Amino acid sequence: MKWTAKDLDMYIQSKEYVDTVLIPLVPITFGSQIKQTGSVNEFLTILSSEIEKQMKGRILLMPTFHYLSDEEDKIDLLKRWTNKVKENNFKHIFFLTSDIEWKKEERELEHNLVWIPAIPLETLENNQAREMINQQVLQILDIFTYNWKNEKK
């Protein structure tokens, strides 16, 4: 389910079945890296939407967590987000990012970080981009499934 009024109505009616939140993490940079961060945003937006589509009814796709790449308190802010999510009885929190800097902070996050290199979709034909996204979705869904199966009871 997406963070839209229609999907949130559906979530409210079936929240006991929705135990997983997906939070895309996307940097914002100006200057020489602006196009690259735009490409990352495009890739993660499409990828997270496809994951949500495959797992509708089990996953709530949160709005993207945007941050300035040189922002020092991004971890604290993200922890506040995740605390609110946990307060609302979600068992699984997954972060999806292409920013390698998050790998350095993975232990501090206490949740599942899925780092995946961004594919510059603007360089691909539509059918190539779709196939690449589908392959990535399958790999990420394997990670989700593994975590669901191995959750602590």
Where are these regions (language model features)?
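Extended, histidine- and acidic-residue-enriched regions that form the cofactor-binding/catalytic faces
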Residues: 1-153
